[in-house]
């Protein structure tokens, strides 16, 4: 994600970084692993990690403002059935994430608290939702596109 002359990236190798686009200078880094592009709003970045943590990170310093643990497994006790998360995107003053259980999850950008979980698909959702013209679009792993307002 590139915004205001800075690139923000997170990778499965375990690093989230902020880089100055023109010089390539590393401004900060965090020990976070993920595959989804961070969402940006004002002075904050929102990112979901491989271990199902939703975080709010300061754009300027990389300091974590808050962290919210999302469900990691279908059966948390036995650690069976891992749940994979994608997103977030900011839509209607809420963070929206999707997961491998076919769910859309709405969370507060203020503290990460989950306000709603919706069954959006009968199968996994492996791509982040996108927002265009006040509509949230989902493409599930079976190729079905759905639109949400």
Where are these regions (language model features)?
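Extracytoplasmic beta-rich repeat domains
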Residues: 1-4, 11-13, 25-41, 67-89, ...
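Structural signature of WD-repeat beta-propellers
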Residues: 4, 11-12, 49-50, 99-100, ...
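WD40 beta-propeller blade core
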Residues: 17, 55, 105-106, 146
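Short loop/turn segments that connect beta-strands within beta-propeller blades
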Residues: 20-23, 58-61, 108-112, 149
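Acidic (E/D-rich), amphipathic helical modules within compact regulatory domains
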Residues: 41-55
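Histidine/lysine/aspartate-rich catalytic loop segments that bind and position anionic ligands
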Residues: 55-73
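C-terminal hydrophobic structural anchor segments
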Residues: 85-109
């Amino acid at each position: 994600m590139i915004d205001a002359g800075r690139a923000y990236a997170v990778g499965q190798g375990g690093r989230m970084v902020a880089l100055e686009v023109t010089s390539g200078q590393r401004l900060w880094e965090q020990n976070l692993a993920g595959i989804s592009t961070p969402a940006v709003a004002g002075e904050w970045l929102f990112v979901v990690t491989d271990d199902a943590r939703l975080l709010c990170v300061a754009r300027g310093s990389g300091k974590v403002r808050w962290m919210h643990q999302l469900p990691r497994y279908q059966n948390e006790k036995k650690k069976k059935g891992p749940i994979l998360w994608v997103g977030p995107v900011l839509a209607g003053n809420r963070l929206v994430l999707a997961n491998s259980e076919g769910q859309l999850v709405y969370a507060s950008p203020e503290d990460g608290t989950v306000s709603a979980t919706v069954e959006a698909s009968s199968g996994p959702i492996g791509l982040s939702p996108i927002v265009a013209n006040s509509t949230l679009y989902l493409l599930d792993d079976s190729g079905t596109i759905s639109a949400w307002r």
